[in-house]
């Protein structure tokens, strides 16, 4: 095999597969990527860890068709340091690959294509959803996925499409993130209900973050396929039964306090410095017109801070893991900063403004100090987004 490709093009596509390729694996070939020619002017780059696979395509001048397998990390480290221009690849005997760019020359050890895992064949993708919606779903839910590998069914997101509505739910057993959005009549033609691994979700964000188009996706009994801008991500489904999340969403929280998300986030960050290192617990005392955040450590001291809130009712104190609150407030703030712009007429002039412009305010809905609390963005009509947290004993 022999081909020539632009350094900038190769660097971009190699960057997408780095998060998939195993750097240290009991199966050595998984540290490699497969590069093969397709037709006269395209190469295909494939990386896999057997659970998640990414396949990219890039324009190249194919001198001789074929395939090569090269160590992924080493190749990426070399390519990103090369000068801009053409990079020439030529496969030699015994799977060695000669690589030149300007005055730079490299000779890389490769492995046979026959040793590379077979990539699942891509099925037709009957469903489409805008990349913006997919990224918003993942950004607002992925943080609540458990990091405990033993809790297999909680190590991904439940993704549902039914009744012209898309929904994503995640939980680690202590908190739950739920988001849904009504779709247009022509957005989905088939229902779906699947568990998607966290790693696949995060890689999907990477390959679709800068896309203004749609993500096409479909499934077979074992895999889910996502395609965006010519890049394909294939992931194994998680097996098992996801918890009945509808039972967790509170139905009788009769008290609501509304506060500024940024003010609360900053206050919790400061006060939590004095929280117990093991539980990270802070207490929120909700009173008319304010919420007081407090934390204490028997060994280090204590701290408190007040945040203004729209609330009229009896005083209630609730304990929380401070990190759970910060995770939610962080993604709400990030979503507001990245909100899309729309054109509006003002005094006869067309101006571009952010949707939901301004500092986000949080609706904090609770019943008492022992029942789960629900938080959502006040006034958000684009998405039905809920975050439910179990309280701590204080």
Regions found by a protein language model. Give the residues of each.
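Structural preference for solvent-exposed beta-strand-turn elements
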Residues: 1-394
């Amino acid at each position: 095999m022999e081909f020539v490709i632009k350094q900038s093009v190769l660097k971009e596509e190699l960057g997408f597969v780095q998060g998939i390729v195993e750097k240290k694996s009991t199966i050595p070939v998984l540290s490699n990527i497969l590069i093969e020619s397709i037709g006269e002017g395209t190469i295909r780059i494939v990386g896999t860890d057997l659970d998640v696979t990414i396949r990219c395509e890039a324009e190249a001048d194919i001198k001789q068709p074929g395939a090569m397998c090269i160590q992924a990390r080493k190749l990426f480290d070399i390519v990103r340091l090369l000068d801009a221009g053409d990079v020439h690849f030529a496969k030699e005997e015994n799977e060695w690959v000669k690589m030149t760019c300007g005055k730079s020359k490299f000779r890389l050890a490769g492995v046979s294509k026959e040793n590379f895992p077979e990539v699942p064949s891509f099925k037709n993708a009957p469903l489409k959803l805008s990349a913006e919606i997919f990224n918003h779903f993942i950004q607002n839910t992925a943080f609540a996925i458990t990091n405990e590998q033993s809790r297999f069914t909680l190590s991904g997101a439940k993704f549902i499409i039914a009744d012209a509505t898309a929904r994503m739910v995640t939980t680690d057993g202590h908190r739950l993130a739920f988001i849904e959005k009504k779709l247009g009549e022509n957005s989905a033609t088939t229902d779906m209900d699947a568990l998607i691994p966290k790693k696949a979700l995060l890689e999907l964000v990477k390959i679709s973050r800068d896309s203004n188009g749609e993500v096409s996706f479909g499934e077979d009994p074992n895999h889910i396929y996502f395609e965006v801008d010519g890049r394909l991500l294939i992931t194994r489904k998680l097996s098992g039964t996801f918890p009945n999340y509808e039972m967790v969403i509170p139905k009788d929280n009769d008290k609501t306090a509304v506060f500024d998300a940024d003010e609360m986030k900053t206050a919790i960050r400061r006060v939590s410095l004095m929280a117990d290192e093991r539980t990270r617990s802070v207490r929120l005392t909700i009173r008319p017109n304010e919420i007081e955040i407090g934390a204490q450590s028997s060994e280090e001291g204590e701290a408190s801070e007040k945040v203004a809130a729209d609330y009229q009712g009896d005083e209630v104190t609730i304990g929380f893991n401070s990190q759970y609150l910060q995770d939610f407030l962080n993604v709400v703030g990030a979503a507001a900063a990245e909100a899309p712009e729309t054109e509006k007429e003002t005094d006869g002039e067309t101006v571009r403004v952010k949707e939901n412009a301004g500092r986000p305010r949080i609706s904090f809905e609770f019943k008492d100090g022992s029942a789960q609390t629900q938080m959502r963005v006040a006034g958000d009509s684009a998405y039905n987004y809920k975050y439910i947290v179990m309280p701590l004993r204080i």
